[in-house]
């Protein structure tokens, strides 16, 4: 099953419905189906949309947890994500700028996912909240073409970010 990487709701829904049709055709034949996903299937994953379409069809579904990108990054770099009483915010960079700003205003630590399109805005907001200096940005963690940037100012301006790009950041003044 191939899903379109678009923001158009109607196109996404068509893709989910097509996946449902294909998956149910195999399940109705008595076959087992595996739906592999990057990260955790219940965390910013296409899986959960297809799951909702299939969950009440009478077929048994077993969802096996995966490792989220930010946990993989923390372990991969030896970068503690959150400690003691710190408050962690997990934010998609695709959210409205005002929401991101409001969340980062109260968070001690942040995970910002899907930064590939809005990096400049995210960087500006992290700087505003004193979270940019020691932030790490990784694109395609654990893959052969992985890119790691420590301190967001160290990224070359012509860096092409991938959809699988995530920032981990900590507030310096707390």
Please give the residue ranges for each predicted region:
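General beta-strand structural signal in soluble alpha/beta enzymes
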Residues: 35-37, 63-66, 83, 112, ...
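Class I S-adenosyl-L-methionine
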Residues: 1-60, 148-149, 164-166, 170-173
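Class I SAM-dependent methyltransferase SAM-binding "motif I" and its flanking Rossmann-like core
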Residues: 42-106, 172
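Electropositive phosphate-/nucleotide-binding environments in soluble metabolic enzymes
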Residues: 13-20, 44, 67, 94-97, ...
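Structural signal for conserved beta-strand scaffold positions within catalytic alpha/beta enzyme cores
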Residues: 1-4, 63, 89-92, 112, ...
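A contiguous loop/helix-start segment that scaffolds small-molecule binding in enzyme catalytic cores
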Residues: 33, 104-174
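A polyampholytic, Gly/Pro-enriched intrinsically disordered region
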Residues: 19-26, 80-92, 154-166
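Short, surface-exposed amphipathic charged segments that create phosphate/polyanion-binding patches used
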Residues: 12-21, 77-79, 103-106, 148-155
């Amino acid at each position: 099953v191939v899903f379109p990487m678009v923001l158009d709701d109607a196109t996404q829904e068509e893709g989910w419905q097509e996946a449902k049709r294909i998956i149910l055709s195999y399940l109705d034949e008595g076959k087992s189906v595996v739906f592999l996903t990057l990260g955790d299937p219940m965390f910013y994953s296409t899986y959960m949309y297809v799951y909702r379409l299939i969950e009440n069809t009478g077929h048994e579904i077993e969802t096996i947890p995966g490792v989220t990108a930010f946990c993989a990054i923390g372990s991969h770099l030896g970068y503690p994500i959150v400690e003691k009483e710190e408050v962690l915010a997990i934010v998609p960079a695709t959210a409205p700028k005002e929401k991101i700003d409001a969340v980062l205003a109260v968070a001690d630590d942040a995970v910002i996912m899907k930064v590939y399109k809005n990096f400049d805005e995210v960087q500006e907001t992290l700087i505003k909240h004193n979270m940019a200096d020691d932030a790490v940005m990784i694109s395609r963690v654990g893959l052969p073409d992985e890119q790691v940037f420590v301190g967001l100012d160290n990224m070359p301006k012509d860096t092409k970010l991938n959809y699988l790009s995530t920032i981990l950041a900590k507030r310096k003044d707390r």
